[in-house]
Design a protein with these regions (language model features):
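ASCE RecA-like P-loop NTPase motor cores
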Residues: 1-147
Length: 147
């Protein structure tokens, strides 16, 4: 059994195990090596692994819609929030299991330094220059939308 977890080369691909064994395998690799990125073929498969692994250890989910056309038409707010929560957790502590699908893996992401610099904190009672705030939001990639 020890040879099974003695991986010398990354990335590695695991085939031929049932879902429960793959889950245990991923958890054991995490315990031995630390951070692990699990890339699944589909969003459904990634969600299945996330549900299974999160029962045993804390892990993060980075979901992206499987189809580019659906991203262009309408971005799911739930998926977007989950991705932001995952990125925020990774900035705090990068020793995690992150589970994503192929589209999540291919997604362009900012560097950690740029992501940290883009953090805006506005508290109740703060005075904010609306023009500076709008310009900052534009710089971060937001766009103005009519309601």
């Amino acid at each position: 059994m020890l040879k099974l977890f003695d991986i010398k080369k990354f990335p590695s691909k695991v085939n031929g195990l049932n879902e429960e064994l793959k889950t245990e395998y991923i958890i054991e690799l995490y315990k031995k090596y630390g951070s692990i990125l699990v890339v699944c073929n589909t969003l459904y498969e990634a969600n299945t692994y996330f549900q299974s692994i999160s029962k045993h250890v804390e892990c993060l989910f980075f979901p992206m819609d499987d189809f580019l056309t659906s991203e262009a038409i309408a971005v799911s707010p739930e998926l977007k929030v989950t991705r932001l929560e995952t990125m925020n957790e990774l900035v705090k502590n990068n020793n995690r299991i992150v589970i994503t699908n192929m589209m999540g893996y291919l997604r362009y992401l900012p560097t950690i330094e740029l992501y940290k610099k883009s953090d805006l904190k506005i508290k109740l009672g703060d005075t904010v220059d609306i023009h500076k705030l709008v310009n900052k939001l534009y710089d971060l990639g937001y766009s103005r939308e009519s309601v």
